[in-house]
Every structure is written in C-alpha cells, then in structure tokens.
Amino acid sequence: MVIVANKTLIRKGEGHKLVKRFDKIGKIEMQKGFLGLEVLVNAKEKEVDEVTISTRWETKADFHAWTKSEAFREAHSGRNARPDYILGNEIEFYDVEVVRMPIAQAQ
C-alpha cells in the first residue's frame, strides 16, 4: 500500500474551502487501486492554513494511472481548476510498512 500526501498551503482563514471540495463523492472512488481518502487539517497557529489530502493506493502505479486519467483531468480543469486561495502544494509518497488494526474486545 502507498499513501500519497498532498500538503496544500492556503490563505489564512480559507482552508475550509478546500475541505469542502473534497467532502463529496467524486470519480477517484471508482479508480483501480484506490483504497481511501482523508482530509487532514493542521490545527497549529500559522500564517497560512494547511490542508493535506491523503490518499491510499494499492500501488504507486495505480496513483500515477489516476493522474493520467480523463477523470483526473476533469476534476482539475475548468471550474474545478486550482483556486486562487491555494498558495502552493507539495506531494509526498509513503510506502506503508506496518498496519495495525483494533482488536475487538470480548463482551
């Protein structure tokens, strides 16, 4: 499993706008190898808002296939193009080495 973290810097007070863009079903949910998505908001006091979109994929190749797909282009063009409140972003890739799940307690 691979995690792709897209850390985005946003004008102070406008982070909620990016969060809202991801608070709906999109085309990514139908992509081969897609395992899930989380939207993370950094609560530290800063001069900018920081929102990280974390996606989980079976393989890095699955993520790259998504970025080359027509669905990706549609999601990132036209009225869905990069809003002016986004100041910049950085994408990081993480290989998942250990996963631990909760153990159900006996009743």
UniProtKB/Swiss-Prot annotation:
Domain ABM residue range list? 2-93
Residues the UniProt record annotates as site (Transition state stabilizer): 66
Which amino acid positions bind heme, per UniProt? Answer: 76
* Gene3D superfamilies for the chain: 3.30.70.100
What EC number is given for this enzyme? Answer: 1.14.14.18
Q: Which InterPro entries match?
A: ABM_dom (IPR007138), Dimeric_a/b-barrel (IPR011008), Heme-degrading_MO (IPR050404), IsdG (IPR023953)
- Is Oxidoreductase given among the entry's keywords? yes
- Which residues are involved in binding Fe cation? 6
- Per its UniProt record, what Pfam families does this chain match? ABM (PF03992)
Query: Subunit arrangement?
Result: Homodimer.
Sum up the protein's function in the record's words: Allows bacterial pathogens to use the host heme as an iron source. Catalyzes the oxidative degradation of the heme macrocyclic porphyrin ring to the biliverdin in the presence of a suitable electron donor such as ascorbate or NADPH--cytochrome P450 reductase, with subsequent release of free iron.
Q: Return the similarity comment.
A: Belongs to the antibiotic biosynthesis monooxygenase family. Heme-degrading monooxygenase IsdG subfamily.
Name of protein: Heme-degrading monooxygenase
Q: Its gene? A: isdG
